[in-house]
């Protein structure tokens, strides 16, 4: 073993091995060799390997939509946030809110219990972060959220509390606050009111869009859940070019931002039934309404025509973007929207009703 250590230390091509090897083979009051070996990748100085999965967040690709935009006056590109570690855009605010709370010493791994109301994707992202950092986490969520989301959160160790779907996200939020009051050492990230949610999109998502379009983006379209994405990206793009137009998207069946009433809809993650505190209405030209039916239809078309298997809110964003792209006044302009999550997360939802039934009824063929 000592000879191996000496050979590694002599390698001129990897001079920074010395610290790592000394740590690996040292016997001074340290853990077992096996434990040191397991810890080695975290400190290995000469690789491009990420220290942990949280460093995979961000830098998602921007892709033009081609077939679904036939006949449009403008170009439409969609940022593919399902390339994130947990396959949704919510990884960005999840890491930002936890990092912000840790920096302010509001939470401590192994001691604090995180509690958060969610429609699914934020819950998955927070559960992912909690698992890595060692937090207990409890999620409240409407019972209409898909089975895939529940199972995914549980796989990260999250505890789930389902709420009455008729009471929407308002009921889910109320239950979360009840748990916050009754749970010792509990903390809520408060995605609907936490400035870190907006700031991470100003710091990362917005600049990525600006860089990938070489500053040529004319219009940005985004569905409104917590409001963090449209507010943060909107502010950033307007700081670079005040002429960029920003549009929000909400379900037609729950159009409270346009003066309507909250109601049931299928665009999970959007249309929370109230105006979130962090939502910046002033950054937007207007909030476009998209029906659940149109959003579902478009999500299916994106898979069939573009090879992009995305969720229902991504379908809604695309419907709104195409609507703007068909306007003569937008001829030749570049419209950017976001595909917020991966479609596989919705296999048990209405999005795949027909295909799921077809798959369940398939019969095996005989093989000679």
From Swiss-Prot:
GO cellular component, one term: cytosol
Protein name: Bifunctional L-3-cyanoalanine synthase/cysteine synthase C1, mitochondrial
Residues bound to pyridoxal 5'-phosphate: 121, 225-229, 313
Tissue-by-tissue expression: Mainly expressed in mature rosette leaves. Also detected in roots, young rosette leaves, stems, cauline leaves, and flowers.
SUPFAM superfamilies membership: Tryptophan synthase beta subunit-like PLP-dependent enzymes
Alphabetized UniProt keyword annotations: Amino-acid biosynthesis, Cysteine biosynthesis, Lyase, Mitochondrion, Pyridoxal phosphate, Transferase, Transit peptide
Compartment annotation: Mitochondrion
Gene behind this protein: CYSC1
Feature: transit peptide: 1-31
InterPro entries per record: Cys_synth, Cys_Synth/Cystath_Beta-Synth, CysK, P-phosphate_BS, TrpB-like_PALP, TrpB-like_PALP_sf
Organism: Arabidopsis thaliana
GO terms of biological process kind: cyanide catabolic process; cyanide metabolic process; cysteine biosynthetic process; cysteine biosynthetic process from serine; detoxification of nitrogen compound; immune response; root hair cell development
């Amino acid at each position: 073993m000592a000879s191996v250590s000496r050979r590694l230390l002599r390698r001129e091509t990897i001079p920074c091995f010395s610290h790592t090897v000394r740590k690996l083979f040292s016997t001074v009051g340290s853990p077992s060799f096996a434990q040191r070996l397991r810890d080695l990748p975290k400190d290995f100085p000469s690789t491009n390997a990420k220290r942990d999965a949280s460093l995979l967040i961000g830098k998602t690709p921007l892709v033009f939509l081609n077939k679904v935009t036939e006949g449009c006056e403008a170009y439409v590109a969609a940022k593919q946030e399902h390339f994130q570690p947990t396959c949704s855009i919510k990884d960005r605010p999840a890491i930002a809110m936890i990092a912000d709370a840790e920096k302010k010493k509001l939470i401590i791994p192994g001691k604090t219990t995180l509690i958060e109301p969610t429609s699914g994707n934020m819950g998955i992202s927070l559960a992912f972060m909690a698992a890595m950092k060692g937090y207990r986490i409890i999620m409240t969520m409407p019972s209409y959220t898909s089975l895939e989301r529940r199972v995914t959160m549980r796989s990260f160790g999250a505890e789930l509390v389902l709420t009455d779907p008729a009471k929407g996200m308002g009921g889910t939020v109320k239950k979360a606050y009840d748990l916050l009051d009754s749970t010792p050492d509990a903390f809520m990230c408060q995605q609907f009111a936490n400035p870190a949610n907006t700031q991470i999109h100003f710091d990362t998502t917005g600049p990525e869009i600006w860089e990938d379009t070489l500053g040529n983006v004319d219009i940005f379209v985004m569905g409104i859940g917590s409001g963090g994405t449209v507010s943060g990206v909107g502010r950033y793009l307007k700081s670079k070019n005040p002429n960029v137009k920003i549009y929000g998207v909400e379900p037609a069946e729950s159009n409270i931002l346009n003066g309507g009433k909250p109601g049931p809809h299928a665009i999970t993650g959007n249309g929370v039934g109230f105006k979130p505190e962090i939502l910046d209405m002033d950054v937007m030209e207007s909030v476009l309404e998209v029906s659940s039916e149109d959003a579902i239809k478009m999500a299916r078309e994106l898979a069939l025509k573009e090879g992009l298997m995305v969720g229902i809110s991504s379908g809604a964003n695309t419907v709104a973007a195409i609507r703007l792209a068909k306007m003569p006044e937008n001829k030749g302009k570049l419209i950017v929207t976001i595909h917020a999550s991966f479609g596989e997360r919705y296999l048990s939802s209405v999005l795949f009703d027909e295909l799921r039934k077809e798959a369940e009824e398939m019969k095996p063929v005989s093989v000679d």
